């Protein structure tokens, strides 16, 4: 199944990107949320709670959803370990629904790029818009094209606390320059005492966006005041060597819920 975080994929993600690990995004998102109205915050594709949990600990009212029950299990366990309460549900980008409106919706580290069909992506942006309160903000990280076209065939490994070995082999099998997508085969392996005990093969597809292209998509969805920033320096225009590009946009205050 494409873009599904199963048992081994979620395990590897939790080892590689544990709760609290920051790539510069945690401080940035906290700083940007200080400029938002008080109220509930939504993190789609919440994963293991790497961003959500530090925000909860800082006093923000954050809730999240994810398409992977395995990832949500890690997030729930991390919340329990810290005596935190969070609303976490299994939902998808295409169908998520809440009976409330949020003052901010945040998507760190390129999660939005899991939506690879342009029409679907535009519909998701409109869905975000509809779930924001007037004056609410959408903050989205996108990886630039350079992050998609690097070397393929990498092999990475992680040791668990019990001494097991997890490996990930990443092999890109297609780059579509018209659709602006890459497709990779990800092979996860779980080893115990030199014996292979489990294997998981996933198809992983991502889409890159041009800066102006995504800005136009935000405006087409109804957003205003689009600010594009490079490398978590708010208001600094992206540069060619930046590793992350952040878009912040606002639902107009004069519209009703």
Walk through the language-model features, giving the residues of each.
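SAM-dependent methyltransferase
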Residues: 139-213
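A short acidic, Gly/Pro-enriched loop at the edge of an enzyme's catalytic core
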Residues: 95-104
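Class I SAM-dependent methyltransferase "Motif I" SAM/SAH-binding loop
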Residues: 45-48
């Amino acid at each position: 199944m494409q873009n599904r975080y199963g048992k081994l994929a979620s395990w590897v993600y939790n080892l590689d990107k544990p709760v609290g690990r920051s790539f510069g995004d945690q401080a940035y998102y906290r700083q940007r949320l200080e400029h938002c109205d008080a109220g509930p915050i939504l993190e789609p594709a919440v994963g293991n709670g790497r961003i959500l949990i530090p925000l909860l600990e800082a006093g923000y009212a954050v809730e999240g959803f994810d398409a992977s029950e395995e990832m949500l299990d890690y997030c729930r366990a991390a919340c329990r370990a810290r005596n935190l309460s969070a609303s976490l549900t299994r939902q998808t980008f295409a169908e998520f629904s809440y009976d409330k409106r949020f003052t901010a919706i945040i998507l760190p580290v390129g999660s939005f790029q899991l939506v690879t069909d342009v029409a679907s992506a535009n519909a998701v942006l409109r869905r975000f818009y509809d779930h924001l309160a007037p004056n609410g903000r959408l903050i989205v990280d996108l990886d630039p094209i350079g992050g998609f076209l690097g070397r393929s065939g990498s092999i990475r490994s992680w040791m668990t606390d019990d001494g097991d070995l997890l490996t990930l082999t990443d092999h890109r099998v297609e780059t579509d320059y018209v659709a602006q997508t890459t497709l990779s085969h990800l092979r996860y392996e779980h080893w115990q005492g030199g014996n292979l005990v489990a294997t998981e093969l996933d198809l992983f597809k991502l889409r890159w966006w041009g800066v102006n292209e995504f800005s136009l998509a935000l405006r087409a969805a109804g957003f205003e005041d689009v600010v594009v920033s490079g490398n978590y320096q708010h208001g600094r225009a992206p540069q060619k060597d930046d590793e992350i590009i952040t878009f912040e946009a606002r639902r107009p205050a004069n519209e009703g819920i």
